[in-house]
Amino acid sequence: MTKRFLAAAAFVLLSSTVSASATDIGATFETTCPFGDCAAGISLSYLGEFVIPTGHMENGVEFGGISGLDFDAATGHYLAISDDRSERGPARFYELNVDLDASGLKSVSVVKQVTLKDKNGEPFAARTVDPESIRLGKDGIYWGSEGDGKALLAPFVRVAAPDGSFVREFKLPEGFAPTADKSTGIRDNLAFEDLAVAPSGDVFVGVEAALYQDGPNPSLTSGSLSRIVRYDGATGEPKAEYVYPVSPIPQAAAKADAGNDNGMSEILALDDHRLLAVERSYAQGFGNSIKIMMMDLTDATDVSAIASLAKNDQRVVPARKSQVLDLRAIGLVPDNIEAMSLGKAKDGTDVLILGSDNNFSTSQKTQFYAFKVLNRPQQ
């Protein structure tokens, strides 16, 4: 099969400047000119880590599975969605208080818990939903479910009211619904993992790895072509689709027959064409590798009319990407990072918060990292 992608645009890796050990509060990390564009530079300063252990209970329900995070400027709190599939408790999101200032991250605590409702106004039945992302939009709370490829349950993006009730649903583009023969559509557990809202109100939704018709999952030697759908946030109608080139798996498992993977686990809009993306990898016997990438969609091809990227002969320009941060490389030991938000500390400090999905596993933890944003791309 023939794939014509403009390789030079696929991945630009520029090393960050590191001022100190990442375990030191105040250590700084700078990517000055990603893509050769110094107006897109980003600088971060480490503010610390806070952990909530697996098994922590809130309102009689186990806390965990944090897969999305977004700052609410009106309250100064963060919304965090759990990927509990209405099994340990109802599908839900939390309002969190993140206590930090320029001196560091002090604590993360639950302010309240809100149950998400289906179209009939009822809590979701068990295994009928898989919440993975959450953002505040202009008319409510935007959240995504990645569906269930095995059960042929389609992914979706919906808008909820503050009380969790259903408001409306975005249109699912052709080619994303799961199929029994796996010829097209989402792969199980690799679907709508990512959600971002741009200043214009446009909404970006990404799949963790390639749709079946677009090619294979990442391997140790090759990457994967993830689609990002751009929606009109006001109407929920798709406007365009882009290709994000997920990197090859960066680390082999400890044993030849053990598992490993890599995928795009979250995106965050910096402006209307630049986003941050989390590439989250796991290798059995090694752990997680977490890299924060900046992507630029300015010259990316709209591939919404291309049914299969694997069988396409047209020239396609994917999103450009440049590495901003490698958490292991700066001395951190990240868990399963799936949540990312910009926000503000109580003293007005601009911050970037990362959060992990503990999979409700006793061998994992709910982990939050905080960074002060010293500089970010200018439009």
What does each model-found stretch correspond to?
Residues 21-379:
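Sequence/structural signature of beta-propeller domains
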